[in-house]
Amino acid sequence: MITFQLEQGEKLFIPFMTAGDPSEEITIDLALSLQAAGAHAIELGVPYSDPLADGPVIQRASKRALNHGMNIVKAIELAGKMKKNGVKIPVILFTYYNPVLQLDTEYFFALLRKNHISGLLTPDLPFEESSELQKNCQSYDISYISLVAPTSKERLVNIVEQAEGFVYCVSSLGVTGVRQTFDESITDFIQQVKQLSHIPVAVGFGISTREQVDSMNKLSDGVVVGSALVKKIEELHDQLLASDTRQDALREFETYAKTFSPLYSFK
């Protein structure tokens, strides 16, 4: 289970990364860099061939990882390897529901527990259809992370009431990806979620600059950053794979990740 003990004024930084991009070994190194940059937890994305919620950046990362043979079982086992190699913060498995359905339920949850996964997030499974998954998560002491979007106001009370770990507040409709601006109605929506929630509220989908982080942190308890970090990994792809440039590339990635972390000031 995930329980964040935030100090007064402390804000969450939850980065997303695709399992196996650019390789399993480097995913572990990148996770350690994110931890060093001040991440409170890591969302580890299972690459999927039909990712409905993902924009082009994460789609490309998924394709690269799938081409290297990554799948849901290997992604879960990769989380265990991350833990063995020094990742101490919680790892949340971000997966579409179809790969989960391909596995026996008991086997899937036993695998999550064996590999020290603390949370599960299934972006394409409607809340109304998630009760079985939520029950299994509770049985295995895993937090089921709930997504809430600006379209789900009528369902908001039920979703937030049952949320665990943190509430993932979707900042805009559509797919993930870098955005320059956000709809003004997001302010009211986040405030509404905050009033209802008994756990931290983090905002994601499109956070790509420090200014956006600071802006969202004024409204919420923190941010989820995905596409911007995955894009940076894509830019550093060749340097990360080459042993003579890998350490420099990891340092560059960590420095970039710090621009989203509330632990570091860039004023």
Curated annotation (Swiss-Prot):
It comes from Bacillus pumilus (strain SAFR-032). The active site is at residues 43, 54. Belongs to the TrpA family. Gene3D superfamilies: Aldolase class I. One of its GO terms (cellular component) is cytosol. It comes from the Bacteria. Keywords: Amino-acid biosynthesis, Aromatic amino acid biosynthesis, Lyase, Tryptophan biosynthesis. It is an enzyme of class 4 (lyase). It holds the Pfam family Trp_syntA. The alpha subunit is responsible for the aldol cleavage of indoleglycerol phosphate to indole and glyceraldehyde 3-phosphate. It catalyses: (1S,2R)-1-C-(indol-3-yl)glycerol 3-phosphate + L-serine = D-glyceraldehyde 3-phosphate + L-tryptophan + H2O. This is Tryptophan synthase alpha chain. Its EC number is 4.2.1.20. The keyword Isomerase does not apply.
